[in-house]
């Protein structure tokens, strides 16, 4: 009986705490792309951590409850926006995040996420904001190389095996790294790998660079 009372008390406490949390609804169209849904998921995670009660709604995007803070994520064919650009606008409790494409929606969501994180969890969203990347390709370079020769090798060449590069096969780490790239508005990843052969190009001015016998 005592355990039952404790359980009921804990359940009531959690219920009352949840009731005291501000509700935020995130709406996406029924045909939302994977990128739009990814942006919604990242926004939901941030709002959850900030203490909000988040409602996810995919399908009907009608703004029907003006008392609830609502965020609508959509892709729009707006030629005034750059590729991967976005437009944030507010009307009352409705915040629209419109992206020129799926990536634009993600970057619009990241803008809201940054503002939540920078304001101690407050929903200080811009009333009007248009933005987009200046450069087409933005990315990071990861080196698949080592600082020393492998035993028995006289050049920088390596087999890409779990033994030689265990981190390269760490899926969980890669997911975190890719999420970091998204947070920094990057859209490409470059792997700088050593060539599997010592050299393949013969240069007349640099004959000593040819370490593989022509025969």
Language model feature labels by segment:
Residues 11-13, 56, 173, 181:
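Generic alpha-helical secondary structure signal
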Residues 42, 46, 79-85, 90-215:
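Feature activates predominantly on carbohydrate-active enzymes
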Residues 5-7, 13, 61, 84, ...:
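Short non-domain terminal segments
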Residues 11-13, 67, 212:
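Prokaryotic Sec-type signal peptides and long signal-anchor helices
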Residues 1-23:
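Bacterial Sec-dependent N-terminal signal peptides
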Residues 19-92, 122-126:
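Acidic, contiguous N-terminal accessory segments
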